[in-house]
Amino acid sequence: MDERPRNLRAMLAEAKDTSELMVDLAYASVYFGDPDMAEEVDELEEQMSELVHDMRAVCVLAARSPREAEGMSSVLQVVSAIERMANDAVDIARIVTHRLGIPRQLVADLSDAEEVSHRVLVSDGSHMAHRPLSSLELTVQAGMRVMAVRRGRQWITDVDGDTVLVPGDVLFLHGSPDGITRLRELAAAPVWEPPRPDEGEVLTDLDRAVDVLVEMKNLSEAAVGVAYSALVLGDRGLAAEVGHLEESLDEMRDHLELWVLRAAADGMDPSSLRGLLHLAEAAEDLGDQARAMVWLVEEGEELHPILGIALGEADEVAVRFPVAEGSTVAGSTLKDLQLNIEPGFTVLAIRRDGGYVYRPRGAVRLVAGDEIIASGPEEGQALLATMCRWELLEDEG
């Protein structure tokens, strides 16, 4: 990006958005086997490196006393964790760019995800060309939201309904995989066929390893989302849950390595197993960095106020709403509610009976007393509050 924000608050918000976009695209590049998408992650990594350098410089300049230095140390800890998350995204994308190999079973299993990221090029003469996003209604037409637009060398991350698309724009979207076919029709992009596992293969330990890795992907994404939520909300309970997720990821990696080695011993081609180990390592480290990010919250230490403010001003905000008796959402499944379309929120976790359900699937039914932890566009949080039978009051301070 040619003109980077120099304000620390703005840079932190951009770094959060960029790191999440990188992780989404990295996993998507594996799913689609798309080298172009993987290379986009590398380009974003260059932008992230510049942001991290600038943020560290600002923190050093701002620490003019021991008290200020202590406050800025928490900011630097978060900056370092964000940088490592971006590096993990690059490592995931290298599975594609370096052709490390990945079993088709994994790619097919990833297609069962409730939400995926996708990349599409806007062609000249397509339905999308020369039209504002608001008129396309992509959330309704395809069940997907535009997270960013790349126009030449410029990245547009503050996308809104007034953004007019032009031929050559590359859109990065997130939403239901069921909408990919319709999305590509609107962009006049080539037809895409979803991956399917090879027929007739005997799946034993490899099948188990793949299932674990898909769960690791889901938990690593949940850990990142819940960690940002814990920082914004200053919630020690959420921070502790990030720790539990990180421990689960550690255990899963141990199991996965064992099953991969057994699969190799059974005669499986080792070249297609390297990517599994590589992906597991990156997914585990995402959990490690999420925990590092919230360690101060978990310990009850004071955070610099700019963290909550900046991360709350990112393209996606974190919210936590109890489900009230008689509300619109009470008694409905997430699939029926389609919160990812309207008001555009992804449910990261549901707190229920003292525990958490992470990355809940569409069949999960909300009940009164549940607490929803979700992320989405700021303009949609009032509607989500209303659906939970709460009124969002504006801060007059």
Task: Enumerate the language-model features and the residues they cover.
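Cytosolic, long alpha-helical scaffolding segments
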Residues: 1-397
